[in-house]
């Protein structure tokens, strides 16, 4: 029989208040709290801590504080990753971000899904869908990316956008919901 954690990573319905999940969530909350308390000028210490939190990152990963995530180990970022203040990643499923990606302030990336039916939602059951972001992507401030989204390479997402469907490579998207407004070179 699968554990709730195994169900979560498999994209199956799982009980979000499971004891094992709560322990993992709290461990990550503590790690994020510790990261957020490191002085901004202590770059080496910050980088060491963020590498402990994330599932994959490089020496050139830079995430401005504060930073929040649920598990951390499900987040994989490529080379030369930069995120500005207040990045929130609900990583119940894997979040994979390519090389040369830049994220503005107050961006939220969600993988957790809940029922829209209040009775079902109150059971604390949910499911998760991975988010994949390609190479050379700029995500403007206050953007929200919903569960299950794939964003192609060479994409710009305008500030304040809500990404509710996949984004092809080589475009600029803006709005709520985010829509393609033009193609980009590259």
Descriptions of predicted regions:
Residues 40, 67-77, 82-150, 171, ...:
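Flexible, glycine/small-residue-enriched loop-and-beta-strand segment within the central core
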Residues 5-6, 53, 123, 130, ...:
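Short secondary-structure boundary/capping segments
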Residues 140-166:
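Beta-rich strand-turn-strand
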Residues 36, 165-170:
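Short arginine-rich
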Residues 1-60, 178-182, 186:
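Terminal amphipathic alpha-helical/low-complexity segments used for targeting or macromolecular assembly
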